[in-house]
A protein has these predicted regions:
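A glycine-rich, hydrophobic loop/mini-helix early in the fold
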Residues: 1-8
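Long beta-strand-rich cores associated with HINT superfamily self-processing modules
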Residues: 12-124
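Intrinsically disordered, low-complexity acidic/polar and Pro/Ser/Thr-rich regulatory regions
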Residues: 118-142
Length: 142
């Protein structure tokens, strides 16, 4: 992908429903436009990476008036975040031999699947306790 955003931020949420709620809340702001959405929660990357990436056009107010700049926001759960941090360290900050790197990559993929199942179970318990409705759609670009 080409560099598209001028700034970035990561929002860490407790539950997957919160990821979609917060992203939709931000997307509903009248002065913010959704430019692009990549939902790696519903469509994880091959390595197991899950996160919701939304690029917004956000107003920056200067003396000459409001100018819109692209800002990427990565929304993810706590579990998605610690998984991604470890995968990033394995991928970019290690000198492990290829065999060990491959072994750990497979283990991380297995962990990603396990975490997805655990998160779904925890989300269901949370919904039952709080009577919260299911929220599961990313904002729409355009």
């Amino acid at each position: 992908d080409n560099l598209f955003d001028g700034a970035g931020i990561r929002v860490i949420c407790n539950y997957r429903d919160d990821v979609y709620s917060v992203s939709n809340y931000l997307s509903s702001q009248s002065d913010i436009q959704v430019l692009r959405v990549k939902d790696y929660i519903k469509n994880p990357k091959q390595n197991g990476y899950r996160s919701l990436h939304v690029i917004y056009a956000v107003p920056v107010f200067l003396s000459s008036g409001a100018h819109y700049t692209p800002v990427e926001v990565q929304f993810r759960t706590i579990a998605m975040d610690y998984w991604a941090s470890l995968e990033h360290a394995l991928r970019y900050k290690t000198d492990l031999p290829d065999a060990k790197l491959s072994e750990h990559s497979q283990t991380l993929l297995d962990c990603a699947r396990s975490l997805q199942n655990v998160e779904a179970q925890m989300q269901n318990i949370h919904r039952d306790i709080n009577g919260a409705p299911q929220v599961g759609e990313a904002p729409k670009a355009g």
